[in-house]
């Protein structure tokens, strides 16, 4: 059970919500603020004074006054008309994050929503009745309207859900959770719809996956150093301290620890080789830059996870209703775009190491890592697959945040495209996962070919894990299942756990 304290969510809590079947409860300390916000809205609605989002239309229709007896219909119509998403359902982990983030934002007491509505969301979450939310349809301003409308429609008994993973109607979902359809009061539909929770949830969910891939890449890169008989001297702490970038310093320390005591490395300490190619030698510089970007993105996304991104905002202490633009997800878009760059570079560097290993001139290993080359092609086309995936990532890494299209009759004339920026991270991460799987296989093959010498004590379990699933490549065979089984292990963090490094979300 995780206690949600609005405005004080942590990265470990968010990772746990996404990855584990934890339940939620709202911190009782937030109740007074929530109730005060709801009362402030009720008072404004009762007076009939024009206030955006409470008794007016929305967007370009903001100047249209809505009579008191139509306020409930206004909120219902808002939710139903905005539920226009398309595409595949959002991943379960992302929906769980979305709901938790929405509860945190509402729980700060500036949205004017009743606890009854929030309790219904928590009940659905804890019953594992999750809204079916199409993943496409948001431009990231005014908030993530379409995705959040699909979440909200379930509270009205409209739309679809997943009940413990099985697709069903919203009414069936409410029944399983012991709930009845709600009637939303003034502003409550808008409070549910307005916000950056979809883009932030997608960005966080994919960031956690990319963090795991980063750690796996450290392990794969270190194993490739041994496979290629590379030097550990470029990882000397003194080099990296002189430059001063913390990510680079930390990455170099990881490589030193992973390669400590490697018999392969000790076997060629006195060779006449002067310098390794950049894909080996400059790993701390490249991976360190990725790490710095990822840490910055995590900082930004944690702030956004705790933010109130509704509009308008209710200030119960003064009774004011202030319209602003906290729904504009530009910070999320930038963070997601930076994560895309980092994840793509992780894969790009791994692809270059695969290319190095299969090149006999550079690695000193048999061509394409197989004996009797010619009749056997070995890792030749596995590298082509890695190259295809790395190239695809370069296109996917194009920043989404530089794009904008005006919407709502030019009232909303600049948007963030944060949801797409966050969503495409999943494709980049999946490509990078498979590149790393191919590298792990290639590096393990190279280490085998260095016999009688072995890799380091830290990397020995990695070799054991790989060889427990995939045998040494002796002769050409149907290769795709080998890649698939190692990619599955990458996704399960089997190799990430070996890295002597952790992110803030894992602490």
From Swiss-Prot:
GO BP, one annotated term: L-histidine catabolic process to glutamate and formamide
Subcellular location, record wording: Cytoplasm
Broad class of the protein's primary localization: cytoplasm
Signal peptide: none
NCBIfam families named in the record: hutH, PRK09367.1
Annotated family: Belongs to the PAL/histidase family.
Protein's UniProt name: Histidine ammonia-lyase
Organism annotation: Burkholderia cenocepacia (strain ATCC BAA-245 / DSM 16553 / LMG 16656 / NCTC 13227 / J2315 / CF5610) (Burkholderia cepacia (strain J2315))
Gene name in the database record: hutH
């Amino acid at each position: 059970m995780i206690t949600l304290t609005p405005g004080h969510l942590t990265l470990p809590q968010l990772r746990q919500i996404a990855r584990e079947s934890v339940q939620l409860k709202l911190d009782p300390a937030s109740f007074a603020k929530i109730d005060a916000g709801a009362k402030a809205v009720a008072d404004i609605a009762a007076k009939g004074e024009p206030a955006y989002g409470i008794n007016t239309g929305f967007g370009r229709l903001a100047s249209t006054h809505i009579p008191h007896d139509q306020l409930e219909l206004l909120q219902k119509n808002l939710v139903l008309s905005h539920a226009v998403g398309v595409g595949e359902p959002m991943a379960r982990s992302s929906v769980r994050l979305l709901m938790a983030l929405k509860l945190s934002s509402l729980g700060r007491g500036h949205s004017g929503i009743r606890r009854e509505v929030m309790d219904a969301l928590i009940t659905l979450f804890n019953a594992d009745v999750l809204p079916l939310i199409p993943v496409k349809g948001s431009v990231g301003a005014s908030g993530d309207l379409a995705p959040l409308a699909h979440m909200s429609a379930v509270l009205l008994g409209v739309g679809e859900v997943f009940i413990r993973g099985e697709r069903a109607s919203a009414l069936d979902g409410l029944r399983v959770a012991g709930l009845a359809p709600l009637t939303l009061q003034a502003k409550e539909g808008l409070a549910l719809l307005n916000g950056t929770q979809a883009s932030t949830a997608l960005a966080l969910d994919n960031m956690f996956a990319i963090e795991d891939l980063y750690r796996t890449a450290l392990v794969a890169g270190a194993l490739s150093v041994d496979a290629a008989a590379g030097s550990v001297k470029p990882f000397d702490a003194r080099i990296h301290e002189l430059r001063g970038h913390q990510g680079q310093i930390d990455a170099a320390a990881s490589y030193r620890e992973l390669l400590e005591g490697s018999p392969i490395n000790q076997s060629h300490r006195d060779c006449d080789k002067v310098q390794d190619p950049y894909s080996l030698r400059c790993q701390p510089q490249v991976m360190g830059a990725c790490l710095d970007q990822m840490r910055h993105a995590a900082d930004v996304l944690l702030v956004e996870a705790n933010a109130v991104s509704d509009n308008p905002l209710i200030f119960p202490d003064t009774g004011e209703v202030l319209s602003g633009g906290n729904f504009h997800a530009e910070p999320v878009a930038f963070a997601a775009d930076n994560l895309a760059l980092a994840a793509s570079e992780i894969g790009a560097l791994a692809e270059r190491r695969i290319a190095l290993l299969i090149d006999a001139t550079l690695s000193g290993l048999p061509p394409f890592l197989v004996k009797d080359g010619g009749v056997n092609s070995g890792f030749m086309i596995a590298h082509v697959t890695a190259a295809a995936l790395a190239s695809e990532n370069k296109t996917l890494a194009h920043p989404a945040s530089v794009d904008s299209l005006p919407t709502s009759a030019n009232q909303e004339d600049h948007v963030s495209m944060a949801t797409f920026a966050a969503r495409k991270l999943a494709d980049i991460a999946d490509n990078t996962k498979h590149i790393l799987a191919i590298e792990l296989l290639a590096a393990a093959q190279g280490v085998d070919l260095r016999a009688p010498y072995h890799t380091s004590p830290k990397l020995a379990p990695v070799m054991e894990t790989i060889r427990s699933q995939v045998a040494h490549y002796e002769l050409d065979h149907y290769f795709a299942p080998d890649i698939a089984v190692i990619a599955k292990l990458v996704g399960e963090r089997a190799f990430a756990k070996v890295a002597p490094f952790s992110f803030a979300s894992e602490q």
